[in-house]
């Protein structure tokens, strides 16, 4: 039961962090790519890799930080929404593919680097 509470609390903080980061980047930068989602997913992927690589032995930490906070910070559903919204009558296949590749390939690379630090 305690792990569910830790995931819930961590997830809440992660979602708040994602919202703040998204608001900041959406007001600060203009881009054809949804840069805020890219940033939170890459940072989250790196931190997940780093946390797993460090093999932190604090019993509550994975539930709170990895599943909770980083699960709330990163967002696959927003990525799916953004990719769907790119499919308009002015659909740009290059933008769509580049954004998809940035998210998935660089996200994996960020996780891999974090794991091996």
UniProtKB/Swiss-Prot annotation:
A GO CC term assigned to this protein in UniProt: plasma membrane
GO aspect biological process, one term: cellular detoxification of fluoride
UniProt: Na(+) binding residues: 71, 74
Domain of life the protein comes from: Bacteria
Catalytic activity: fluoride(in) = fluoride(out)
Keyword Hydrolase tagged: no
Localization, UniProt: Cell membrane
Topology within the bilayer: Multi-pass membrane protein
Pfam families xrefs: CRCB
InterPro entries: FluC
TM stretches of this protein: 1-21, 46-66, 95-115
Regulation of its function: Na(+) is not transported, but it plays an essential structural role and its presence is essential for fluoride channel function.
Annotated keywords: Cell membrane, Ion channel, Ion transport, Membrane, Metal-binding, Sodium, Transmembrane, Transmembrane helix, Transport
GO molecular function: fluoride channel activity; fluoride transmembrane transporter activity; metal ion binding
UniProt key word ATP-binding: no
PANTHER family hit by this protein: FLUORIDE EXPORT PROTEIN 1-RELATED, FLUORIDE-SPECIFIC ION CHANNEL FLUC 2
HAMAP family membership: FluC (MF_00454)
Role summary: Fluoride-specific ion channel. Important for reducing fluoride concentration in the cell, thus reducing its toxicity.
UniProt-recorded name of the protein: Fluoride-specific ion channel FluC 2
Organism whose genome encodes this protein: Staphylococcus aureus (strain NCTC 8325 / PS 47)
Lineage: Bacteria, Bacillati, Bacillota, Bacilli, Bacillales
